[in-house]
């Protein structure tokens, strides 16, 4: 990541090197302020403005990477209450045995298979959408099968997945999609690892 060049690239001396009196210091901040450090843009935001779902009275942001309105979560489900089913495992075909997701949202864990596979398998089993919850801290930006003929699919944090599970175990497996407004959601990480 980052740029492998310096401010002397293509200079008139033909060496692509800074002159001794003009070192290439660039713009550096903590934690890479040590004089011998090579810095790369590697800091994550500690919060994101996101569309959200409401589960049991708590709001959780979601990531929607759909490029078309056909698979956009908000375009399809704005301000609606949706029934969902927690699919065990990772949302592979075998995980749907004995599970009825027809007309509901399939909620699956990250891992085990690709995001487009999770989406396609949920759709093949009758789901109207797929929510993938992270199996580790942080958020997930996933690529999906986009466009007409595919169901919407979004990703949520591990905490949102846990809230969805708790809500389902209480016997009230529904969540509400926001009305196209966003909220700032803080995440646990601030520096890339």
Give, region by region, the residue ranges found by the protein language model.
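Structured lumen-facing ectodomains of secretory-pathway proteins
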Residues: 1-193
């Amino acid at each position: 990541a980052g740029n492998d060049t310096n401010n002397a690239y293509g200079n008139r001396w033909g060496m692509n090197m800074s002159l001794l009196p003009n070192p290439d210091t660039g713009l550096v901040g903590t934690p890479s302020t040590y004089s011998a450090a090579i810095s790369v843009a590697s800091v994550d935001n500690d919060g994101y403005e996101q569309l959200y779902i409401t589960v049991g009275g708590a709001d959780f942001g979601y990531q929607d990477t759909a490029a078309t309105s056909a698979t956009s979560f908000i375009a399809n489900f704005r301000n609606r209450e949706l029934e969902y089913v927690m699919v065990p495992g990772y949302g592979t075909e075998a995980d749907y045995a004995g599970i009825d997701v027809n007309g509901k949202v399939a909620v699956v864990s990250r891992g085990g298979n690709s995001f487009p596979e999770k989406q396609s398998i949920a759709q093949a089993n009758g789901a109207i959408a797929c929510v993938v919850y992270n199996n580790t801290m942080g958020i997930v930006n996933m690529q999906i099968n986009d466009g007409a003929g595919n169901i919407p699919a979004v990703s949520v944090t591990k905490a949102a997945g846990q809230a969805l599970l708790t809500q389902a175990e209480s016997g009230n497996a529904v969540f509400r999609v926001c009305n196209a407004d966003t909220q700032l959601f803080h995440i646990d990480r601030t520096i890339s690892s």
